[in-house]
């Protein structure tokens, strides 16, 4: 059984709802899922998972501080140990959505392996957005090969 870690930060609850949908998709694909807010996630969480989903809201065309905090704290303790670990990203926004680029850039610095296109959600995740988030979770679980 694959272990999928979902690390996110949320201000209004939209990104939390998106994280929950990603978790539903990963669980439906047979993965064991751990969801943590960026402020409480630890570098060991990243080392112990088989795949990771990174989610945030748009903060002035950048990822939110909670996710950035986790990535800052995790970089050096995990350096060279997470290369090619499958990852996917999701992002909620009110109109721009350009902050997803910051997540993908930092994931590249970790040398994580992108296994699905990012899901961008304008506002509250509903309808097709929920389906896309669940699919993202399933793809992430499948990418581990376990």
What does each of the following model-derived ranges do?
Residues 9-13:
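Short polar catalytic/cofactor-binding loops
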Residues 2-4, 14-17, 21-29, 34-41, ...:
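FMN-binding flavodoxin-like domain, especially the glycine-rich phosphate-binding loop
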């Amino acid at each position: 059984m694959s272990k999928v870690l979902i690390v996110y930060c949320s201000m209004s609850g939209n990104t939390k709802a998106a994280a929950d949908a990603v978790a539903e998709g990963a669980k439906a694909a047979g993965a064991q899922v751990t969801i943590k807010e960026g402020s409480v996630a630890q570098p060991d969480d990243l080392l112990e998972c088989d795949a990771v989903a990174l989610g945030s809201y748009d903060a002035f065309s950048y990822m939110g501080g909670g996710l950035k905090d986790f990535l800052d704290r995790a970089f050096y303790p995990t350096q060279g140990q997470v290369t090619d670990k499958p990852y996917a990203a999701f992002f909620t926004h009110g109109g721009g959505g350009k902050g997803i680029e910051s997540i993908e850039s930092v994931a590249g610095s970790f040398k994580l392996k992108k296994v699905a296109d990012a899901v961008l959600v304008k506002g509250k995740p509903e309808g097709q957005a929920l389906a896309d988030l669940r699919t993202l979770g399933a793809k992430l679980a499948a990418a581990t090969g376990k």
